[in-house]
Amino acid sequence: MKLTTHNTMSYQKPKQLWAKIIPFVARCQSVDYIKQYELGAVGFDLRLFWDKNGNLEFRHGIVSYPADNIWEVLDFIRDHDLYVRVLFELRSYNKKHVKNVETLKTKFKDFCKEIEDKYPTVKFYGGCATCDWEQLYVFKNDEHIPEIGLYSSNTSLFKSPNKILSVIDDLCPWIYAKLMNRKNMKKYKDSEQYISIDFIDIQ
C-alpha cells in the first residue's frame, strides 16, 4: 500500500471569513504537508485556482486557502522524490459564477508548464479541471498513477442516493476518515496499490 493525501493543503486556515467560522467544512487534512510525509504519504494533491486579484490559491470546492508557500511545498516534493497531482479546482456547481473561466484555464496551463520547467525531476500528474475532468495540460513525467480514492466524496458512508446525506458526506470528510481509514488501510496493507485518503493522521 502506498499512501497519497487528498486535498493536501486543506489543513490551512481558509481565506474566507465564513469558512473560518466553520473550518471543518471541506477540510480533508489536519496536519501540514511535512507531517503528512512523515506519516507515510508518497504523493500530494494540489488543487489550484486564482482569486479576483490574480493571486494563486489552493482550493477545495469554493473554499480558498493561501498558496504563498507554493514554492516551499514544491521544493519539498522535489527533495523527497514525491508524486504530486496538480488540478484546476473549479466545480460544476460554481463554474457558472466564474466569468473568466477560459482565462483561468490558460493561467493553469501556463503555471503547469512553469513548474514542470522549474522542477524537471518531479513526478507531476493530473493537469485536469475538476468540474468535468477536461485534460488541460499533459505532464511529461505523468506515470498515470492508478490511485484508489478512499474518501467520502468517492466512497459514500451512507450508500444512499439521498442528496441531503450526500451533502453531509461531502462536507464533513472527517466522519468518513474516522470510521473507515483504519479499515481501508488494513484491506490494502499488503497491496502495491496507491490509495488516496483524507486525514492521514487517522490510522
Where are these regions (language model features)?
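C-terminal intrinsically disordered extensions
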Residues: 113-145
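Conserved, mostly hydrophobic/aromatic
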Residues: 47
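Long, acidic (Asp/Glu-rich), low-complexity accessory segments flanking structured domains
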Residues: 1-43, 52-79, 83, 93-95, ...
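Glycogenin-like
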Residues: 66-126
